[in-house]
């Protein structure tokens, strides 16, 4: 850092200081459920939404939920029972939430699993020992060792997103204080996000067309110029 700071400071001083008008995003968001067909025999099934649209706020318990989904609900239902190569989920401070499967032989079945996630959380019940494991896994993700480049990326991201130390401290406290009841309280957030039903699939033409009622639009992933 001692070597970086003076060099970067000089770079900043040389940047143009003229005021630039703020740009406006002039577009209307649209929810177009799209199926992208390809020669693949497996699917990549994604569904997302935003829980802040329903008036809910971000909490550190959502980081614990990601671990729970990764090792329990999504892993067991999408990966173990469903046969997908993998699955993932996540939530952001701006309210965005997603669930994704990859190299998945299923389509509708996986979408149903996403839809039922809130029901799973309403009845979530694990032992104190398992809850501690989920929290430890979450802290492990938060405290992953980083090289200088990774630290710089994290700090720059925090700066751009206006995430201060107090916000991170609050999030960590919410992770450490998480329990079964806190996870159950996330059910409305997940239901809100999944009910927005931003849905996209890349996969087999046969499978996507078989479930065509799930989509507003179906088109080739790669358009061949003829």
Residue ranges with predicted function:
Residues 3-9, 112-117, 214-216:
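Short amphipathic alpha-helices in soluble, non-transmembrane regions
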Residues 177-226:
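In a subset of proteins, long, contiguous C-terminal domains/tails are tracked
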Residues 42-64, 70-180, 186, 195-203:
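M16 family metallopeptidases and their MPP-like homologs
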Residues 10, 16-17, 26, 33, ...:
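Context-gated lysine
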Residues 1, 5-8, 33, 156, ...:
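Generic intrinsically disordered, low-complexity segments enriched for polar/acidic and small residues
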Residues 2-77, 223-226:
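His/Glu-based metal-binding/catalytic segments typifying zinc-dependent metallopeptidases
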Residues 9, 19-20, 26, 125, ...:
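Short, flexible coil/linker elements and helix-boundary hinge sites characteristic
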């Amino acid at each position: 850092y001692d070597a970086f700071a003076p060099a970067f400071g000089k770079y900043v001083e040389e940047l143009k200081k003229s005021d630039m008008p703020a740009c406006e995003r002039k577009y209307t968001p649209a929810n177009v459920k799209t199926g992208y067909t390809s020669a693949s025999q497996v699917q990549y099934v994604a569904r997302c939404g935003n829980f802040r649209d329903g008036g809910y706020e971000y909490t550190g318990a959502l980081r614990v939920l990601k671990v729970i989904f990764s090792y329990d609900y999504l892993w067991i239902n999408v990966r173990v029972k469903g046969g997908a190569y993998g699955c993932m989920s996540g939530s952001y401070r701006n309210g965005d939430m997603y669930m994704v499967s990859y190299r998945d032989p299923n389509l509708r079945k996986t979408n149903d699993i996403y839809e039922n996630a809130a029901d799973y959380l309403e009845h979530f019940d694990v032992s104190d020992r398992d809850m501690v494991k989920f929290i430890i896994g979450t802290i492990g993700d938060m405290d992953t060792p980083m090289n200088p480049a990774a630290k710089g990326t994290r700090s720059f991201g925090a700066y751009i997103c206006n995430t201060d130390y107090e916000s991170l401290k609050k999030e960590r406290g919410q992770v450490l204080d998480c329990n079964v009841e806190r996870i159950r309280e996330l059910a409305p957030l997940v239901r809100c996000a999944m009910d927005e039903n931003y849905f996209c699939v890349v996969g087999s033409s046969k499978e996507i067309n078989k479930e065509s009622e799930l989509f507003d639009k179906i088109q080739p992933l790669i358009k061949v110029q003829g």
